[in-house]
């Protein structure tokens, strides 16, 4: 699971 604060 990648860490993406905003997409």
From Swiss-Prot:
Family, per entry: Belongs to the frog skin active peptide (FSAP) family. Peroniin subfamily.
Entry GO CC: extracellular region
Signal peptide: none
Function per UniProt: Induces contraction of intestinal smooth muscle in isolated guinea pig ileum.
Residues carrying Valine amide: 7
Protein name: Peroniin-1.3
Compartment(s) of residence: Secreted
Disulfide bonds: none
Assigned keywords, A-Z: Amidation, Amphibian defense peptide, Pyrrolidone carboxylic acid, Secreted
Keyword flag Secreted: yes
Tissue expression from the record: Expressed by the skin dorsal glands.
């Amino acid at each position: 699971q990648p860490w993406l604060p905003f997409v």
